[in-house]
Amino acid sequence: MPPKSGRAELRACLVCSILQSTNDFLTQGCPNCEDILEMRGSAERVAECTSLLYDGMIAMIEPSESWVARWQRIDKRMRGIYAVRVTGRAPQDVIDAIEARGGVYRPRDAVED
């Protein structure tokens, strides 16, 4: 859950767009993407795989039942607070890992290459 002190401390995951504090990413990793991102314990990796620049917030309580979750492609993700749009791209090694597992990396900034 987001810290009580507000938005200024939140970072967004560049893969799934979940919002957490820097400390939460550092101590717990990403609840959706940790097996690929491996942020837990690495401040450098948290900085590479998350962004302070994002627009909008979505409180997702029942992702599997939400049209907003389907629209944002987070309907199979954990409950939490998500950004609508995140500025930045995941590192190439992350994109390669997603593709090696048969997935497709979809940037969260809504900008087409």
Curated annotation (Swiss-Prot):
It comes from the Eukaryota. It is found in: Nucleus; Chromosome, Centromere. One of its GO terms (cellular component) is DSIF complex. The keyword Manganese does not apply. Signal peptide: none annotated. InterPro entries: RPABC4/Spt4, Spt4, Spt4/RpoE2_Znf, Spt4_sf. GO terms for molecular function: RNA polymerase II complex binding; zinc ion binding. A zinc finger (C4-type) spans 13-33. Keywords: Centromere, Chromosome, Metal-binding, mRNA processing, Nucleus, Transcription, Zinc, Zinc-finger. One of its GO terms (biological process) is mRNA processing. Its main location: nucleus. The keyword DNA-binding does not apply. It holds the Pfam family Spt4. The SPT4-SPT5 complex mediates both activation and inhibition of transcription elongation, and plays a role in pre-mRNA processing. This complex seems to be important for the stability of the RNA polymerase II elongation machinery on the chromatin template but not for the inherent ability of this machinery to translocate down the gene. PANTHER family: SUPPRESSOR OF TY 4, TRANSCRIPTION ELONGATION FACTOR SPT4. Component of the SPT4-SPT5 complex. Interacts with RNA polymerase II. Belongs to the SPT4 family. This is Transcription elongation factor SPT4. The lineage of its organism: Eukaryota, Fungi, Dikarya, Basidiomycota, Agaricomycotina.
